[in-house]
């Protein structure tokens, strides 16, 4: 064979070999992704949860890998709730197989134990998980554009132009996790009792939270899903809590958790520039102690006159909510 012909054949041979290798790799990765989906389904069903997937269809060759999951149904083993959707797509980058993206392609119906249904829809609703190694979480998150929550049995719908939530290990301390939540341009479905003057439009709700003993959150116990986390000393540290709603514009800090009776236990410190509307709304709320109602109303009237700002100290201890040290109302168990 002439050298000239050899130099023509070698590149084509390498190209064909690379193409065949990529075809093999893509199909191997697709098969492995399907296997993991079915393994997760089997594991959930074995634990009492019901997971049903009508059909898995492969798409995206040669550049992308997308598994179309049709007729997905998830019924939790505890809590009595279930979720259903006609389609969700699992996207995997063949060059980054440890990063998976799940995108809702149809509305999601969530049914609670009491039969109430919330329909979830969005222009884009994406959940992603990125792993370090085989089983170490690097980051997980959910992002939605024009999110709509509609409960057909209730008046109105909740709308948020943008919602982003992420969780990742906190590099500053082993066993702690950072949780971030940011919702912008929110429209509430209906007025909030005693806060009617604040309106339905919430410009922003943002939280930066550190969860201690985060791994214990996943160790649910029957009838007490957060029991292991609470008993293990789990707490939440609010490094920032921002709320821009009507006359209330604040960014505070605090910490909290649950007591042995599953009631809120902790403290928030919220700087408020215009405290009168906030104090008035709290005073007019349900189940407020009569003495606290009078004290809060007088305090609100004083701030109307002075126009001063305030740093609200809100505490929850021994089953009682306190504002500026005043016992305001009893606190029921969270669940």
Give the predicted meaning of each segment.
Residues 66, 138-141, 176-180, 233-240:
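Short, hydrophobic/aromatic-rich segments at coil-to-beta transitions
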Residues 46-174:
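N-terminal beta-strand/beta-hairpin edge segment
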Residues 73-81, 108-119, 146-158, 187-199, ...:
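Flexible, membrane-facing loop/turn or short amphipathic-helix motifs
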Residues 2-13, 54-55, 224-235, 241-244, ...:
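Extended terminal
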Residues 8-26:
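Hydrophobic membrane-insertion alpha-helices, especially the h-region
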Residues 56-59, 85-95, 121-135, 158-174, ...:
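Extended lipid/amphipathic-ligand handling interfaces
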Residues 28-45:
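Alpha-helical transmembrane signal-anchor/signal-peptide segments
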């Amino acid at each position: 064979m002439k050298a000239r012909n050899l130099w023509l054949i070698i590149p084509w041979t390498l190209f064909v070999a690379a193409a065949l290798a990529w075809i093999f790799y893509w199909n191997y990765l697709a098969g492995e992704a399907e296997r993991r989906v079915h393994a997760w389904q089997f594991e959930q069903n074995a634990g009492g949860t019901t997971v049903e997937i009508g059909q898995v269809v492969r798409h995206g060759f040669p550049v992308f890998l997308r598994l179309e999951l049709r007729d997905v149904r998830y019924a939790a083993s505890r809590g009595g709730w279930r979720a259903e959707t006609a389609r969700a797509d699992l996207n995997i980058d063949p060059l980054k197989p440890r990063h998976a993206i799940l995108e809702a392609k149809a509305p999601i119906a969530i049914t609670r134990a009491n039969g109430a249904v919330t329909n979830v829809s969005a222009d884009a609703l994406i959940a992603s998980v990125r792993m370090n190694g085989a089983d170490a979480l690097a980051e997980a998150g959910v992002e939605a554009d024009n999110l709509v929550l509609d409960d057909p049995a209730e008046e109105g719908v909740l709308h948020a132009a943008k919602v982003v939530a992420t969780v990742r290990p906190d590099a500053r301390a082993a066993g702690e996790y950072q949780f971030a939540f940011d919702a912008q341009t929110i429209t509430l479905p209906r007025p909030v009792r005693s806060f009617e003057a604040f309106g339905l439009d919430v410009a922003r709700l943002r939280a930066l939270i550190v969860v201690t003993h985060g791994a214990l959150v996943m160790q649910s116990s029957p009838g007490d899903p957060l029991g292991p986390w609470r008993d293990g000393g789990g707490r939440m540290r609010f490094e920032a809590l921002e709320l821009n709603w009507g006359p209330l514009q604040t960014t505070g800090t605090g910490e909290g958790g649950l007591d042995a009776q599953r009631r809120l236990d902790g403290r928030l410190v919220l700087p408020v520039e215009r405290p009168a509307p906030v104090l008035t709304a709290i005073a007019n709320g349900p189940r407020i102690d009569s003495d606290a109602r009078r004290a809060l109303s007088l305090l609100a009237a004083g701030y109307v006159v002075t126009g001063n700002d305030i740093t609200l100290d809100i505490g929850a201890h021994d089953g009682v909510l306190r504002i500026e040290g005043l016992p305001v109302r009893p606190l029921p168990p969270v669940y």
